[in-house]
Amino acid sequence: FLWGALIKGAGKLISRVVGSLKKKKQ
């Protein structure tokens, strides 16, 4: 199982969600 790919995908998803949340707050 490729844990590195999974972690990379999760990181991208989390950063995307955090970015959208920051935009909504502004």
Curated annotation (Swiss-Prot):
Keyword Secreted annotated: yes
Matching InterPro entries: Antimicrobial_4
Main location: secreted
One GO molecular-function entry: toxin activity
GO cellular component, one term: extracellular region
An individual GO BP term: killing of cells of another organism
Keywords: Antibiotic, Antimicrobial, Fungicide, Membrane, Secreted, Target cell membrane, Target membrane, Toxin
Subcellular location field: Secreted; Target cell membrane
Expression across tissues: Expressed by the venom gland.
Alphabetized Pfam families for the sequence: Antimicrobial_4
Annotated function: Has a broad spectrum of activity against both Gram-positive and Gram-negative bacteria and S.cerevisiae. Has insecticidal and hemolytic activities. May act by disrupting the integrity of the bacterial cell membrane.
Family, as annotated: Belongs to the non-disulfide-bridged peptide (NDBP) superfamily. Medium-length antimicrobial peptide (group 3) family. Ponericin-W subfamily.
Protein name from the UniProt record: U1-poneritoxin-Ni1b
Lineage: Eukaryota, Metazoa, Ecdysozoa, Arthropoda, Hexapoda
